[in-house]
Amino acid sequence: MNEFQRGGNKHRSWQQCFLYPLFFQEDLYAIAHDYHLDRSSSSEPAENCISNAFSFLTVKRSISRIRQQNESIVLFWNCDRNQWIDRNRSSSSELILEGLVVVLEISFSMRLKHSLEVMNGWKSFRSTHCLFPLMEEKFPHSNYILDIRVPYSIHPEILVRAFRRWIRDAPSLHLLRRILYECQNSSNAENLQKAILVVLRENTKFYLFLWNSYVYECESILVPLLKRSSHSRXXXXXXXXXXXXXXXXXXXXXXXXXXXXXKKIWLLKDPFIPYVRYGERSLIAXKGTHLQVKKCRYHLLNFWQCYFHLWFQPYRVCILELSKNCSSFLGFFLSVKMKSLMVRTKMVDDLLITYIITNEFDAIAPIRSIIGLLAKERFCDISGRPISKLAWTSLSDDDILDRFDRIWRNLFHYYSGSINQDGLYCIKYILLLSCAKTLACKHKTTIRVVREELGSKLFTKSFSKEREFISSFFSKTRSQRERIWHLDILRIIPLANSWQKIQNKKK
């Protein structure tokens, strides 16, 4: 990758984003083949056997055939006809498609690096770990939240229009258009005949690239808009102060000056706008009246529709009042609590007492929903009564203990900062008894016998006492109200992810 980028910096066509000659480089398809082997080695053996059918001789013949035919635009189309994006497509077409994505990713990464250098004034943290400090964030200037869900069914021409901004050669655009229309024809969605689901198959590299480039286009217009609005509000505040001073001189002239100054002020009055995104969900915290937030939502929808030339459904942008509504995000219920801080100001003759009111997030773990998902996985019934995991009775005792320990460790680490810790211990009790019942069912004995035979091994190896250790360590220096987040989480856990999908379907 680095060699291609260093070589591309010297080449003029690469600087102008002429990508079509790079599609004929055999080394790129070798990179895609190695990536596919690394990915399939950690998955099912069947995928590894299918990848052995890939032949570089087919790629070389296709390259030479297309070089001889100047009128040909579709690359490698004769390798596997009508099997580009099919569910039963061969490994050759899949790997060739991933080779095309390698070329696009190199150019996209260079464009992303350039855009980050331009937007260096915007303080952005592109990591999963920055999402958890959001739960501890205070919003003294915000009273509403815009809950935005990015649409994932779009027309292929919209993606081509987005690619046209950074790909300048017509053959590459025609090739991408042909592939995208094949994706559209292969989708079986009846109500989306003219759209393409960019997250239809998240496990393929091509759809991941489509989703990342599409989200980048969405944020490339949203983030500068928020940044520009914050600067414009700072300048407009001085104009509003000048209009207020003119109000003492002439009331009629002040009304006209205030109306002119109000046009410069943005709809929302918040000088600091928190923005966070994970997947298709985005949250924007803002300050203002309900009418101002509705106008902001209206203009945001119109701006998005004019930019992408697509119908942005209004229900995808919800307005939530922080003091009344709870929002589900990242597998948590987010409720806002108003906290007042008393400030005493001592003067010469008097003592002034004022109260500063701030809004704080309270992250609540959805205990009932987690119990329902555990019941779906056969760890308990719908009422929360633990049952044995019959599918694991053929495993060894250490494997059973390790699996239950891994489930509890992931749940505990992910929801360690939630305020309802008692509910987590209910989940621990369910998993602990389910583990004991699974071992008892395997050895055809009772739970009491299992606890007597394993003894402390059941409770130390599985479900370790790390919470008590951490709490005792921090209690010496911090208050008990402080919450502890474990930042060894690289992604949202599957239980929280599945629960979040259920919540999205309800909206």
Curated annotation (Swiss-Prot):
Q: What does the record list as GO biological process?
A: mRNA processing; RNA splicing; tRNA processing
Would you say which domain of life the source belongs to?
Eukaryota
Extract the signal peptide range.
Answer: none
Q: Which family does it belong to?
A: Belongs to the intron maturase 2 family. MatK subfamily.
Annotated keywords: Chloroplast, mRNA processing, Plastid, RNA-binding, tRNA processing
Q: Name one GO cellular component term.
A: chloroplast
Function, as annotated = Usually encoded in the trnK tRNA gene intron. Probably assists in splicing its own and other chloroplast group II introns.
Localization annotation:
Plastid, Chloroplast
Provide the protein name: Maturase K
HAMAP family cross-referenced by the UniProt entry: MatK (MF_01390)
What species is given as this protein's source?
Araucaria heterophylla
Q: Does the keyword Plastid apply?
A: yes
